[in-house]
Swiss-Prot record:
Residues recorded with modification N6-acetyllysine: K356
CDD domains xrefs: TPP_E1_PDC_ADC_BCADC (cd02000)
Annotated positions of the Phosphoserine modification: S337, S339, S347
UniProt keyword Transmembrane, yes or no: no
Source organism: Pan troglodytes
Keywords: Acetylation, Magnesium, Metal-binding, Mitochondrion, Oxidoreductase, Phosphoprotein, Potassium, Thiamine pyrophosphate, Transit peptide
Binding site for Mg(2+): E238, N267, Y269
PTM-bearing positions, type N6-succinyllysine: K356, K380
Record's protein name: 2-oxoisovalerate dehydrogenase subunit alpha, mitochondrial
Coiled-coil region list: none
Main location: mitochondrion
Length: 445
């Protein structure tokens, strides 16, 4: 009986939070997410003996044994602004972005697409060691980035290059990082696509899944303590949401009331594992209410829906000091990485459908064409220009040498300890003796 009562109590609490999270604000000028901390109706009790006294939950008693079925709550709806033809569905949800901003969204997405194609092919030619494309997910990157303040701190996973692209991170630095040359801010110590930029408030990417989530919560808590008037946004995939760090991060953010946006890119696959084998519940957004986090599910291929949800979440996270969870539904058109062959676990027809029928770049292009802000001649000219820009940065990066091997020992301690100094001297002796066996001419002197 106690188990049934507890289950009913949790279900009713979650149902109330979920419904509150999904209601769009209807007052003039407001969009996106519902008001936080909905006021509950006070239940009347004839005596104190009837009133629940449990400190861990606030709920009513029931007198019938009833286990809560996992499918008793209908699926969380997907918020969208544009249909697949780029037409605004509900005029009241149109963000009315100026032409210049929409063009920046489009050019950031297409420039990222061009860079992906060139760097993917360069890996296949053996010019770089590894790469991960962003095909199909460009809208989640730039739509969210456009809604943030440039000083908001970003914790990425590994497929958020578009956020940096929107923040005008130079193509030369993208290329330098992938080549690991002397212009790489990380001095060639990281795998390709592990970008980071202090000036653009983008924390360097780390390979282990979900480690960035509790770290981002800590940064958000620090921002709150400092009254910094900024948010932290943390990106991750639906696969990473199954890691223990994700759940710890969600709970910390909720209990410490941190100004953070958890942005989940649900692209259908955790490497080769489809969502049908990852979870049995209603995706990732459904987990938010259980932690007391305001949540919403959006069409990740609709850049305006992503923009609206992120903008409203940011506004309220700063004003109310509370976390928000956005689940952006999208599709990973490319392979997981250059180490993956997705044809082993999904059909070509499936990939072609998303590439041809529901691509975020195509949807935004339809919108631009309908507004008279873009035409086929501009499209051809921009594609040619963007490829030229990427190729120039690519060729420049390829010509630059790798960092000096001595830099392996720097940036660890302010003053190098004796043991590390011995290792540095040992490497120098080894290279002096056997240098002809290494491509030292590729390294900076």
């Amino acid at each position: 009986m106690a188990v049934a009562i507890a289950a009913a109590r949790v279900w009713r609490l979650n149902r109330g939070l979920s419904q509150a999270a999904l209601l769009l604000l209807r007052r003039p000028g407001a969009r996106g997410l519902a008001r936080s901390h909905p006021r509950r109706q006070q239940q009347q009790f004839s005596s104190l003996d009837d009133k629940p006294q449990f400190p861990g939950a606030s709920a009513e008693f029931i007198d019938k044994l009833e286990f809560i079925q996992p499918n008793v709550i209908s699926g969380i709806p997907i918020y969208r602004v544009m249909d697949r033809q780029g037409q605004i569905i509900n005029p009241s949800e149109d963000p009315h972005l100026p032409k210049e901003k929409v063009l920046k969204l489009y050019k950031s997405m297409t420039l990222l697409n061009t860079m992906d194609r060139i760097l993917y092919e360069s890996q296949r030619q053996g010019r770089i060691s590894f790469y991960m494309t962003n095909y199909g997910e460009e809208g989640t990157h730039v739509g969210s980035a456009a809604a943030l303040d440039n000083t908001d701190l970003v914790f990425g996973q590994y497929r958020e290059a578009g956020v940096l692209m929107y923040r005008d991170y130079p193509l030369e630095l993208f290329m330098a990082q992938c080549y690991g040359n002397i212009s790489d801010l990380g001095k060639g110590r990281q795998m390709p696509v592990h970008y980071g930029c202090k000036e653009r408030h983008f924390v360097t990417i780390s390979s282990p899944l979900a480690t960035q989530i509790p770290q981002a919560v800590g940064a958000a808590y620090a921002a709150k303590r400092a009254n910094a008037n900024r948010v932290v946004i943390c990106y991750f995939g639906e696969g990473a949401a199954s890691e223990g760090d994700a759940h710890a991060g969600f709970n910390f953010a909720a209990t410490l009331e941190c100004p953070i946006i958890f942005f989940c890119r649900n692209n259908g696959y955790a490497i080769s594992t489809p969502t049908s084998e990852q979870y049995r519940g209603d995706g990732i957004a459904a987990r938010g209410p259980g932690y007391g986090i305001m949540s919403i599910r959006v069409d990740g291929n609709d850049v305006f829906a992503v923009y609206n949800a992120t903008k409203e979440a940011r506004r309220r996270a700063v004003a109310e000091n509370q976390p928000f969870l956005i689940e952006a539904m999208t599709y990973r058109i490319g392979h997981h990485s250059t180490s993956d062959d997705s044809s082993a676990y999904r059909s070509v027809d499936e990939v072609n459908y998303w590439d041809k029928q529901d691509h975020p770049v195509s949807r935004l292009r339809h919108y631009l064409l309908s507004q008279g802000w873009w035409d086929e001649e501009q499209e051809k000219a921009w594609r040619k220009q963007s490829r030229k820009k990427v190729m120039e940065a690519f060729e420049q990066a390829e010509r630059k040498p790798k960092p000096n091997p001595n830099l392996l020992f720097s940036d660890v301690y302010q003053e190098m300890p004796a043991q590390l100094r011995k290792q540095q001297e040992s490497l120098a002796r080894h290279l002096q003796t056997y240098g002809e066996h290494y491509p030292l001419d590729h390294f900076d002197k």
